[in-house]
Amino acid sequence: MARTKQTARKSTGGKAPRKQLATKAARKSAPTTGGVKKPHRYRPGTVALREIRRYQKSTELLIRKLPFQRLVREIAQDFKTDLRFQSAAIGALQEASEAYLVGLFEDTNLCAIHAKRVTIMPKDIQLARRIRGERA
């Protein structure tokens, strides 16, 4: 038997079209100005999941170096004025800070999941720190 080319067909499944109100019908019949195509948008959560996968793969520092350096210097001024830092020292502080924050956010996420939520909240961070023994 010879193969035949299949043609595309419209799907027949799905919901039946509802009757439109008069205002909607009038709005639809009005001519649209130009063929302006609305920009493509991903479904909520898709981009977030893509970013999670991207940042879990990578090893680079996520906080910019100069803002972090300014923060370190600002905090250090409370203890002693005119302190100087080697660039390696600031790098080590940033590496440790980011590792701590990533771990804290992982624990925070587990606390939110335990509460049957997907959104982390301040109370999740407080619980994670309490369990770790960082805050009594």
UniProtKB/Swiss-Prot annotation:
Keywords assigned: Acetylation, Chromosome, DNA-binding, Methylation, Nucleosome core, Nucleus, Phosphoprotein
Record flagged with keyword Phosphoprotein: yes
Modified residues (Phosphoserine): 11, 29
Gene Ontology terms: cellular component: nucleosome; nucleus
Modified residues (N6-methyllysine): 5, 28, 37, 80
InterPro entries from the UniProt entry: Histone-fold, Histone_H2A/H2B/H3, Histone_H3/CENP-A
Origin: domain of life: Eukaryota
N6,N6,N6-trimethyllysine PTM positions: 5, 10, 28, 37
Modification N6,N6-dimethyllysine, positions: 5, 10, 28
Self-association state and partner proteins as the record states: The nucleosome is a histone octamer containing two molecules each of H2A, H2B, H3 and H4 assembled in one H3-H4 heterotetramer and two H2A-H2B heterodimers. The octamer wraps approximately 147 bp of DNA.
Family recorded in the similarity comment: Belongs to the histone H3 family.
Protein name as it appears in the record: Histone H3.3 type 1
Source organism phylogeny: Eukaryota, Metazoa, Ecdysozoa, Nematoda, Chromadorea
